């Protein structure tokens, strides 16, 4: 049984389902599609998903789709609300209804207030949007060659990342070398997604010829 404070999603099949949903969230995917991808019966997968995620599989798909659309509304301001809704499988009226039901505001109003939502998020720790934009000027993008990693996908708020990293590095210290890279993937926007539903991944590169792989 999963410990109460354990944020790691341990089940391989659940991780496979989540990855599939993330990769195809802008397509018209169903629970049947996810189950087929995982080679599980629909009802068995639905039961496992709820046990591991405390959320119904269908609701997870719907939530991720709406929250990704909300993120697009924030960052792709040159695109219309209707265009973004259609990208995620909604007609104009259906998008507004589903969006309001989940986020308690209309897509149009959300876009207008998105900057304020960023600054109000507890994850922002009092940082203003101007400060965030200034920091963005110092960010560089580097393209890396494909690499082998050991990783853990976790669910929970981002406030304890330092402790999560310490535990992760200690757990996989036997796999580390002087060339090891540590990579963090924060998947959700905590100004949109409930903090306890946010996901992140901690990754550590591992040499392909490492003895542990033989």
Sequence positions of predicted segments:
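Small-residue (primarily alanine) positions within well-ordered alpha-helices
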Residues: 17, 35-38, 69, 85
């Amino acid at each position: 049984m999963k410990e109460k404070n354990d944020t790691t999603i341990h089940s391989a099949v659940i991780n496979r389902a989540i990855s599939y949903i993330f990769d195809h969230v802008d397509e018209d995917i169903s629970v049947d599609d996810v189950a087929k991808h995982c080679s599980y019966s629909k009802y068995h997968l639905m039961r496992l998903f709820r046990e591991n995620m405390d959320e119904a599989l269908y609701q997870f798909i719907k939530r991720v789709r709406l929250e990704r659309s909300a993120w697009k509304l924030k960052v792709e301001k040159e695109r219309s609300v209707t265009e973004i809704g259609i990208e995620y499988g909604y007609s104009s009226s259906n998008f507004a209804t589903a969006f309001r039901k989940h986020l308690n505001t209309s897509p149009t109003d959300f876009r207008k207030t998105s900057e304020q939502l960023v600054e109000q998020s507890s994850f922002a720790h009092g940082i203003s949007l101007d400060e965030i934009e200034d920091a963005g000027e110092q960010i560089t993008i580097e393209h890396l060659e494909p690499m082998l990693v050991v990783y853990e996908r976790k669910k929970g708020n981002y406030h304890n990342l330092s402790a999560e990293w310490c535990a992760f590095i200690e757990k996989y210290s036997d796999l580390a070398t002087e060339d090891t890279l540590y990579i963090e993937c924060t998947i959700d926007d905590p100004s949109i997604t409930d903090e306890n539903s946010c996901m992140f991944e901690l990754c550590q590169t591992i040499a392909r010829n490492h003895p542990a792989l033989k």
